[in-house]
Amino acid sequence: HVQRNKTKHLAEKFAWVHGVDRLIIAERLSSQRLDSAEPLNICLQVNIDGQDSKDGCAPEEVATLVEQISQLPRLRLRGLMVIPAPNNLKAFADAQALFEQVKEHHAHPDDWDTLSMGMSGDLEAAVAAGSTMVRVGTALFGARDYQK
């Protein structure tokens, strides 16, 4: 989830942003990205299983957002990013189906190539369901110490 007050820094310094979940955030990133820079790669964050504790747009908003965001200059909308509830393996299949369904709404469908889902504990199931990018921080660095 990207906050409005962080977009300028992200637009100037990064090549990828995974937490775009609203049109206003994409518009800000687009307007703040330098013309001289490569387009900013973004993934639309989707709350695939409706968790109250998670950010992301609703699945029913995705087609419209893909249509709108894929037309913005200086951005390259690459795909979806989802973080389902633990042990909700059905959400991976739901995300894959949504990813395929909304491709036709993309202004540049050849850019639509990234389904970011799965973490250290469920990466095998995510990859089996079609994930092209996984987050493996725990596998690399160990579990977080929340007591600090």
Describe each PLM feature range.
Residues 1-121, 127-129, 141-143:
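Conserved alpha/beta-domain cores
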